[in-house]
Swiss-Prot record:
Keywords: Cell membrane, Disulfide bond, G-protein coupled receptor, Membrane, Phosphoprotein, Receptor, Transducer, Transmembrane, Transmembrane helix
GO biological process annotation, one example: positive regulation of cytosolic calcium ion concentration
Tissue: Pancreas.
UniProt GO MF annotations: G protein-coupled purinergic nucleotide receptor activity; G protein-coupled UTP receptor activity
Protein's recorded name: P2Y purinoceptor 4
A Pfam family recorded for this sequence: 7tm_1
The species this protein was found in: Homo sapiens
Domain of life: Eukaryota
TM stretches of this protein: 35-61, 73-95, 113-131, 155-174, 197-222, 247-269, 288-309
Membrane topology, record value: Multi-pass membrane protein
Physiological role: Receptor for UTP and UDP coupled to G-proteins that activate a phosphatidylinositol-calcium second messenger system. Not activated by ATP or ADP.
Entries under Gene3D superfamilies matching the protein: Rhodopsin 7-helix transmembrane proteins
Ranges facing Extracellular side: 1-34, 96-112, 175-196, 270-287
Disulfide-linked positions: C108-C185
Length: 365
């Protein structure tokens, strides 16, 4: 439509160049929905994400020390979510102003970088929680060795650095360009570099999403098989129910936030590379734009994990909100997600090598 003056190239934030196909140049469609959907959804994520994660950080820092390994992972997850939601006001303005970016190229690069940094750090922190939980349920002795808070802290630092290192090329791909009086902040890159960007993005997706997703599914599959096997003369313990809640929340975050975004983004890239016809490009572009807010919504869903799995976290949160009596702080955090089977017995020693656990036979678990 001439009134919208919105071609596929404009909707993608691109201008004609050596990498543009004739299909893209000739395909026109209305994308005004984006200028309502994205500002509104990002505003909701900003309000909810900041409102949920800022108090969470405060509780972790001032009320929930000392941390166990799981609390360490959750703190870094909340920190990642908070950093991301603080960048959303610029995107809210950008889409509300119909793709006009007045903040400069450097901030454009940083905001686009921060989106993927949060996305993949969240994926890896959730994977760390999943592996940690798996070890506690299925291999309690190994959990003694690998579940130390210091090791968890080093692993979190490695996650931040590895994800940042993998995404450094994104700082070079993403840029701004002018369209008349409008300044665009590209979500991908220039048309002439799009092929290279797809190769880079696909490698990052496989390494930072595909592998962690597979590891998480395997861990939770093995955990669920063990947890759902009945124990003679024993009801399901609270620790087992907490484990099942953890499985449900993490899988929900993956299913709602991460999987749809990566599937639609892959189809979107393929449609452009294969020069699909206008109707297909139209549909794919709309679906891809719709799933972007879902990827951001993990910043709002992650705090649900803290509520469902941390008894001490819930108590401290009630106190922060004005309800409940103060509880004495103890060294053992009930945020710990490593729990041994109900009918296991352990002898704790100064070192993991000297500790031992006796668990039921495999045919009874």
């Amino acid at each position: 439509m001439a009134s919208t003056e919105s071609s596929l190239l404009r909707s993608l934030g691109l201008s004609p160049g050596p990498g543009s196909s004739e299909v893209e140049l000739d395909c026109w469609f209305d994308e005004d929905f984006k200028f309502i959907l994205l500002p509104v959804s990002y505003a909701v994520v900003f309000v909810l994400g900041l409102g949920l994660n800022a108090p969470t950080l405060w509780l972790f820092i001032f009320r929930l020390r000392p941390w166990d390994a799981t609390a360490t992972y959750m703190f870094h997850l909340a920190l990642s979510d908070t950093l991301y939601v603080l960048s959303l006001p610029t995107l809210i303005y950008y889409y509300a102003a119909h793709n006009h970016w007045p903040f400069g190229t450097e901030i454009c690069k940083f905001v686009r970088f921060l989106f993927y940094w949060n996305l993949y750090c969240s994926v890896l922190f959730l994977t760390c929680i999943s592996v940690h939980r798996y070890l506690g349920i299925c291999h309690p002795l190994r959990a003694l060795r690998w579940g130390r808070p210091r090791l968890a802290g080093l692993l979190c630092l490695a996650v931040w650095l590895v994800v940042a290192g993998c995404l450094v090329p994104n700082l070079f791909f993403v840029t701004t360009s002018n369209k008349g009086t409008t300044v665009l902040c590209h979500d991908t890159t220039r048309p002439e570099e799009f092929d290279h960007y797809v190769h880079f993005s696909s490698a990052v997706m496989g390494l930072l999403f595909g592998v962690p997703c597979l590891v998480t599914l395997v861990c939770y599959g093995l955990m669920a098989r063990r947890l759902y096997q009945p124990l003679p003369g024993s009801a399901q313990s609270s620790s087992r129910l907490r484990s099942l809640r953890t499985i449900a929340v993490v899988l929900t975050v993956f299913a709602v936030c991460f999987v749809p975004f990566h599937i639609t983004r892959t189809i979107y890239y393929l449609a452009r590379l294969l020069e699909a016809d206008c109707r297909v490009l139209n549909i794919v572009n709309v679906v891809y734009k719709v799933t972007r807010p879902l990827a951001s919504a993990n910043s709002c869903l992650d705090p649900v994990l803290y509520l469902l799995t941390g008894d001490k976290y819930r108590r401290q949160l009630r106190q922060l909100c004005g309800g409940g009596k103060p509880q004495p702080r103890t060294a053992a955090s009930s945020l710990a997600l490593v729990s041994l089977p109900e009918d296991s017995s352990c002898r704790w020693a100064a070192t993991p090598q000297d500790s031992s656990c006796s668990t039921p036979r495999a045919d009874r678990l």
